[in-house]
Amino acid sequence: MNILITAVSSSTGPSGICRHAYSLACCAVSRKEISQVTLVVGKWQESYFKHSFQMEDMKLSVVVVDIHNDAFARNLWYLCELPRLANAVAADIIHLSFPVPIRRATLNRPVVVSLHDLYPYDEPDNFGFPKVYFNRVFLQQCLGEVDLVTCVSETTLSRLNTRFPAVAKKKGVVVYNCVNIKSSRHSYSVITDRPFFLMVAQHRANKNITMALRVFGELLKRERIDRRTLLLLLGNHGPETTTIKSVIEREALGDSVKLIDGVSDEELIWLYKSCDILLAPSFMEGFGLPIVEGLLCGSRVVCSDIPTFREVGGEACYYFDLYSDKGSSGLATAICDALTKPKRKAEDLERFSLEEIARNLMTVYFGLQENSIEETNRGETVALHPAGS
């Protein structure tokens, strides 16, 4: 079987979509049933993928798309050029790493899309207006065109069922994100001689980075944490970057907060292993990849008590209530509490392993292929025996 995986997005650095696309490729090449995997990235993503991931597998071919990195050009590529590429590489299945506009009739093969969240509806501030309305249209169009929707968590499937019950019933299945980070791999230090907290998040409203900054600043002022402690924010710049920088300036945190766009997997492993606290105060998430990666590497995780984090983190995390009367003081209390206790041992993380997710994906792919063959055979039968003959 030949799989084509698309990752062409606006991201130029660390993002959940990029890591997800790479993990899909790793799952596919690990299976003997798969003969070829084609991973498609934008020209602006090429350096990040090569720097951050191991891409040497003989079954993996990386195709770099040289177009403008703007929404119109990317969407036009999916609509017009993806069908040509799929034919050129003789793909049996197309796996979209996130929802994009496609025309199923021009693709002539089964298409599956990974659904991470429903942010165009649940977190419109992530996109701004009127852009969010275009994202809603593209999401609906994609969900209507694809053959199957693999939701990255039960929480995401539940949100899909709330918004699009017919799609959830007919096409929705849960295939967790593959967490393909090896804590045993040799790691490289990024920071020396300073304790630090880590937050892995794109600069978007749902990540609640500004609360983390204010709480961190308050802990420093009140000397409830080591005054040398650094808060490292790892993630792509985005709609909230200007606000984040203004909070850093207003709280006089310039020497205590560091923004980083990208690191290699080896550097990321070191950060997870070495941080005093891994922070995730999000309002809403589809999965929570940094939490699972952090737990696999032994991080002490402090996060908001939201359904997705409970689903993936279980009892291994230190939770705080975003909506209690205590407000941000709840996060401060959770941080201080976590620092005084040993790291908790995470359980049931094998459900996110490459082996487990690869098996689940094979079930999805072969099911789609069998359905496609049956539909083709039915079509041929109708053609051979037209009504009234």
Per-region residue spans from a language model:
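Carbohydrate transferase catalytic cores enriched for Leloir-type hexosyltransferases
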Residues: 1-389
